Design a protein with these regions (language model features):
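Conserved N-terminal beta-strand and adjoining loop/helix that marks the start
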Residues: 1-21, 37
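Short secondary-structure boundary/capping segments
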Residues: 5, 13-14, 26, 33, ...
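Conserved hydrophobic "DFG−1" position in protein kinase catalytic cores
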Residues: 15-16, 23, 88-91
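Conserved Nudix-box catalytic region and its N-terminal flanking loop in Nudix hydrolases
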Residues: 17-57
Length: 105
């Protein structure tokens, strides 16, 4: 049994503003539907830096103080492993805007 495997690290962030939560309607055929903003972690990038970057790219918001609140992993049909780090924050600045990833509200 090998100790090495193909793994992709991704992240998602629940952004809360009082009694509202930001969601994204993703248009990607690989991951469509209503979800939280997030994406992949680039080689050499920290998990925190990755979630801050992805939220900025997909929503126009700059988040701070993201807190890890869960981790989920699964294998696809080809034994490729995905590991998702779930974060949450109530700290952000900027103006909400949709991106080519999908609409946000």
């Amino acid at each position: 049994m090998s100790r090495r495997e193909s793994v992709e690290f991704v992240n998602m962030c629940l952004i809360k503003n009082r009694d509202k939560v930001l969601v994204q309607d993703r248009v990607s055929p690989n991951w469509p539907g209503i979800t939280f903003p997030g994406g992949h972690v680039e080689r050499g990038e920290s998990f925190i830096d990755a979630v801050i970057r992805e939220v900025k790219e997909e929503t126009g918001l700059t988040i701070s103080k993201p807190q890890l609140c869960g981790i989920k992993d699964w294998y696809d049909d080809e034994d490729y492993r995905y590991v998702v780090h779930f974060y949450k924050t109530e700290h952000f600045t900027g103006e909400l805007q949709s991106s080519d990833e999908g609409n946000v509200w």
